[in-house]
């Protein structure tokens, strides 16, 4: 026999896997549900970033305004604190993460766990499905807070800044 020719053989599994893989229909429906959530989550993050930038800009405008010092401080302070609380619910406490301490589960931690369900060889498990559902529920609870900040709180602060003759720092 030659060593360089083709040789047919059968591969026998050493052991059976513990988990049975999911069927394509289940996997695909999970993947679609995850993608819908991913788009929603990404849009919430984008709005959060825009809100943070506006708060920072409005703070600069208040510092440069010709009105009495501190007049806008309470409104801006409350908006900033509300924004930080929302960020904590979405991503966990950044200070805790920085020093390696565990955070309570956030939308991000549930999303990451749910996302790992599409990267496994056997498909999403019940744990992945549960994490995705929790992330969706948490996002639904937090979305009204984000939208209130965007549509009510920040426009109200802008009107107050304009009435106090604060410069428009967004165009500077």
Residue ranges of model-derived segments:
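Mature extracytoplasmic or organellar-lumen-exposed domains after removal of signal/transit peptides
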Residues: 7-19, 23-172
